[in-house]
């Protein structure tokens, strides 16, 4: 009897295993990424305080912009894609040139698709290649794939450091190769994908290859009321960081009752303790006020013992007297520099980001900022441009923020997904409250038991999109509310 039961179980399980193994990542809701770095707050690395206070990345030797002209091939069906295009020596010289960032539909490849509730593909999650009615655009273009290739020269000062490859936005799923070696996979069209490519790069010339799928299982969570466009549509760049480095930090402030004093808390998470060479580090947090006026002393400093592994974030606190408060009416910003040095005093990296002292709370059935009740006068904003689609320029974002201020709008909801990181910087600087919304919308599946929010196998995909948004944007003073999604 036991043998019969085991054989029966085996017969039931084997087809499931075979099906799982035969599913590509872009049709598997349980695989949202492979080898992608954990989400982190937005920061940029510099070599000195002087560089960092300018916020001019062109001065940083630890930043390499990969925007520009890439070789590009487009097909309408995955079976037609150039399967081995990432291999060294593969001839892409005859391919088209495509500017990155951009949406390929606006460059003559395929057709932009607009729909609201109804999915532009068959509603049979997680599958994307199921047949659709003849009137669907997807009937003509089942699942276009864009293959991107470009070369880059690794800067000499990246040597003996970690190299991170950062994609700020790619729709909807992608595979990445460096020098012919597969690096990883990522979904979620509205948040960054970052990969540690240290072991894949070499001195001199390198080749980066990216394969982008227009539709994936992730598309089931991206059923917003908008135009669907695809490709590498936000910035791509390389960052150089020390072998052991401050990977993520969270700055928080609490206040005494009259706001005359703030307690600043830093939660610092480090990475790179697997290195054979153990580094002892000194870390300093500096604050710069208006006109880059530096506060006289480091807010706090602490040491990192290279012989230890720090699994939990390190927490440090400091008292700040009479901080200038941030609000939409008076957006006072401080420039935060976090300096990492080795024991010999050599600066290994300076990380730069803005910070605002403010307190948000709900009491007496009202929303309060810095001890004063406020009234929301808000709009919804899609991150889109009439000419460039998803590849929204900094100038276009600035025009939106200026219009908000001119019309006395004090709040924007990033409907219905996280926007470009630069947009939050503008809201910080100009004074716009932000309701930050996760890239979760699946109303094409309805709201009953069939809703993907009720399906256990989709839980990780939902939660990761929410958490990764929060991790990226947690230090922006403009973000006063989190939205877990829309119509999902």
Enumerate the predicted regions with their spans.
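Bacterial Sec-dependent N-terminal signal peptides
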Residues: 1-23
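N-terminal pre-domain segments of enzymes
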Residues: 21-65, 69-71, 78
């Amino acid at each position: 009897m036991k043998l019969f039961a085991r054989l029966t179980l085996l017969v039931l399980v084997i087809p499931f295993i075979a099906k799982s193994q035969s599913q590509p990542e872009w049709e598997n809701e349980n695989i949202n990424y492979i080898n992608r770095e954990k989400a982190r707050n937005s920061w940029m690395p510099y070599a000195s305080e002087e560089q960092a206070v300018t916020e001019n990345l062109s001065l940083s030797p630890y930043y390499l912009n990969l925007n520009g002209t890439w070789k590009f091939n487009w097909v309408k069906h995955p079976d037609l894609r150039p399967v081995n295009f990432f291999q060294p020596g593969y001839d892409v010289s005859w391919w088209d040139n495509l500017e990155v960032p951009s949406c390929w539909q606006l460059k003559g490849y395929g057709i932009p698709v607009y729909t609201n509730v109804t999915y532009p593909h068959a509603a049979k999650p997680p599958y994307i290649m199921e047949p659709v009615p003849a009137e669907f655009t997807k009937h003509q273009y089942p699942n276009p794939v864009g293959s991107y290739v470009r070369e880059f020269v690794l800067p000499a000062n990246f040597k003996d450091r970690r190299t991170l490859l950062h994609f700020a936005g790619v729709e909807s799923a992608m595979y990445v190769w460096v020098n012919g070696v597969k690096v990883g996979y990522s979904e979620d069209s509205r948040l960054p994908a970052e990969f540690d490519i240290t072991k894949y790069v070499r001195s001199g010339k390198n080749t980066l290859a990216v394969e982008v799928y227009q539709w994936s299982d992730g598309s089931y969570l991206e059923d917003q009321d908008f135009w669907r466009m695809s490709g590498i549509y936000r910035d791509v760049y390389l960052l150089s960081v020390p072998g052991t480095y401050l990977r993520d930090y969270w700055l928080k402030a609490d206040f005494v009752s009259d706001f005359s004093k703030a307690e600043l808390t830093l939660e610092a998470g480090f990475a790179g303790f697997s290195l054979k060479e153990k580094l002892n580090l000194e870390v300093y947090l500096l604050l710069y006020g208006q006109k880059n006026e530096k506060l006289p002393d480091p807010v706090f400093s602490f040491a990192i013992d290279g012989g230890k592994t720090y699994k939990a974030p390190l927490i440090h606190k400091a008292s700040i007297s009479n901080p200038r408060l941030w609000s939409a009416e008076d957006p006072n910003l401080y420039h935060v520099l976090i300096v990492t040095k080795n024991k010999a005093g050599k600066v290994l990296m300076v990380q730069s980001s803005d910070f605002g002292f403010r307190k948000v709370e709900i009491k007496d059935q009202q929303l309060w900022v810095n001890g004063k009740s406020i009234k929301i006068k808000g709009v919804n904003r899609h991150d889109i441009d009439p000419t460039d689609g998803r590849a929204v320029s900094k100038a276009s974002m600035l025009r939106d923020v200026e219009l908000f201020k001119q019309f006395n709008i004090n709040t924007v909801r990033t409907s219905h997904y996280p926007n470009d990181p630069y947009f939050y910087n503008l809201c910080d600087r100009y004074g716009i409250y932000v309701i930050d919304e996760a890239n979760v919308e699946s109303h094409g599946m309805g709201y009953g038991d069939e809703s993907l929010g009720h399906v256990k196998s989709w839980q990780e995909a939902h939660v990761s999109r929410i958490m990764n948004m929060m991790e990226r944007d947690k230090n922006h003073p403009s973000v006063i509310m989190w939205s877990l999604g829309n119509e999902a």
